[in-house]
């Protein structure tokens, strides 16, 4: 595990059923081992079999060392995924550009430990390389995320029991995302889109940089980007520079204080809830609906109702045609009073992989009413093989060496191998790493 603190996050996205410590302890009872790679002795470190300190930002180098050893020892074995992989032959030459001795030096992890961990991981009956926030918000984070999955693939642990597996949610939302990559780029620094979205990190530059396409208005739903994003002061300046900012949020906080208008929705206990996001990260297949606990006051609207009305207003403002205005108004009335969030959830459940459809005699199939009748949720089975059917690539294969990551390796090498890291340290006014190794 790299850069994850289960004791604090309770496992975050892998916490189905909570009690992460119990799950980690059960791994040991089965003869397994839990290894944590983290530059800080976190609250979770004391529960690990091993904790290795690592130089901040050097996670990619550590993973390259592991992969290099696995290939050198002849331990690379993709298992049943072998016929569903492209780019296998590229990986070994790519990692062999780096010297293992230098990797040990820049990561702070002994060469003998790197070799041992690589051999133990590749030789285990099942294993998984997993990382979270700590490796996602640092320099070379993209490379680190890629290399972790390379580790899982080359050791035969991708989509295998005991390895990296994927749930089958009761409402399949992934097919709706129309996943895409680099079909267009951002205006200022040319960042590629992913699934129709840009990273939040570029919002400030898109607001502050003049020119055609400059962001001048913002509609925000929840979140507190001044605190949650890096360089909050720059975000404050950007928000203050907007011509108009609408916040849909129940709170006046560090971000919404810049809004021209705040539209507060009803509270979370005043509306029903079905989780669409976290079911994508479950460690079992299950489904649960939480009904509202309190009646919504007539003056309060849900987020869905607020956005439904806003969309209707936008649509009518964008046309001068009276017939179109009338049509948009009729659609709005239909959606507002007929297509409620509960009905959307019910349709998703009924026509999902476990759904009852419109068959009234299908007693086993899922529907919203069935979830309401089982308030603690319904177990839908353990995780099962989902690849290659679950792949969204055109050829139904995993591209093990995407060009965007391959092209970024020279930057990694320049930083850690060709003296870039030492140059940065000598030019910096700071001579300390703000990382504590103190025991909690």
Which stretches of residues belong to each language-model region?
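Surface-exposed loop and adjacent secondary-structure segments within mature catalytic domains
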Residues: 178-183
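Long, compositionally biased stretches
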Residues: 371-440
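Cofactor-pocket helix-loop regions in the catalytic cores of large enzyme subunits
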Residues: 1-160, 165, 169, 189-387, ...
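Glycine-rich, small/polar surface segments that engage phosphate groups of diverse ligands
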Residues: 173-174
